[in-house]
Amino acid sequence: MKTNSLTSLKDNNRFFETLRSRLGYLIASRTFLKKSDAKESYAPQSFSGFVADAESFLIVMPESSEDFSNALEFAGLIMKKGKKVSLFVKEDKIANLWHNSYYNYIQVKPEDMTRLELPKRRFAHMLRQEKFDVVVDLNIPENIYCSVAANLVDSKYRIGFRKRNSDKFYNLQIINNEINSAFSYRNLLNSLQMF
């Protein structure tokens, strides 16, 4: 009897998480994605030399600790190429970066997020004021908050890993077949070097 109630509780939680995620994507597509952005995404876009010509990168850092440390290596390699790198990072991860004073940060606090895991209006307005040549979202699993944040920043090129609804947020998507994020980020860096 107890097992059945635990199973139904897990099923209910999974149902509500799925519902919350779908509702979040619906609201994000109607609130944060401008219709002009959607029209522009269908227009042909040249990626020739965009990484070589780019001066500033915003790297949206992942949440898991292992992915975070691998993402720092990725950011370091971009910086070694002479690019100005800013990190979009959650408040609880800032302590890991105190020794990396050569990065600029956009710090995300818990109060910057709604219950549907979307940026609050004030934070979204602040993000719209930011401008970068390239935005790279290093979240491999689905993360609606980071996908929306990557889209709010003023940038011509938005790069992310392929996941559900990613075509709404990124104009360059990388297919990820790796289990280890270090390999995924290395493959992404190799792909970017072609540009």
Located regions from the model:
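Active-site-proximal region of nucleotide-activated glycan assembly enzymes
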Residues: 2-24, 165-195
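Short N-terminal or domain-adjacent regulatory/targeting segments
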Residues: 2-3, 8-56, 65
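Flexible, charged surface loops at secondary-structure boundaries
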Residues: 50-54, 79, 127-131
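Histidine-anchored nucleotide/phosphate-binding helix
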Residues: 57-60, 64-83, 87-88
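Cofactor-binding loop segments of dinucleotide-utilizing enzymes, especially the Rossmann-like FAD-
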Residues: 62, 90-92, 163
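Short, well-ordered alpha-helical microsegments
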Residues: 67-68, 94-95, 143-146
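Conserved nucleotide-cofactor-binding alpha/beta core module
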Residues: 79-128
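Active-site and donor-binding regions of nucleotide-sugar-utilizing enzymes
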Residues: 110-178
